[in-house]
Amino acid sequence: MPLLRLIDCGCYDGQDKVDLLADTFLADYWRQDSLSAGIEQVRLGSFKTKRPPEIVGSGYVVKSLEAALWAFEHSDSFEEGTLMAVNLGDDADTTGAIYGQLAGAYYGESGIPAHWRQQLAFKPQMETLADQLYQAGWANQ
């Protein structure tokens, strides 16, 4: 999902949420035919004008991405947005995973509630893997 990846990169770069979600964010990057019509509509901000029940957390990638971006735009914390995303129902785990990737990049580990982080199964293994992925990314630069 190149659109989500580029928004993630903007998060890591410290971009403001308003800028990340603007239809002008990296607008020069996209060629006329580089995104499917549905993803292009999401890139242009379809999530900004819709509300539930128009926003749905289905397993269809366009709808899931739209729902995750809707929750990201309409929340002020990792916790609030996560609850908004998963409470849309339907394929809540997919929407929550997409939201979590984006919001995790934006808010960082410290933005995830401590009581959630403490409950993670396999936390040491995930931290080790995350560190390895981070180092591998820098090694390829």
What are these regions (language model features)?
Residues 1, 63, 67-140:
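Catalytic phosphate/nucleotide-handling subdomain of diverse soluble enzymes
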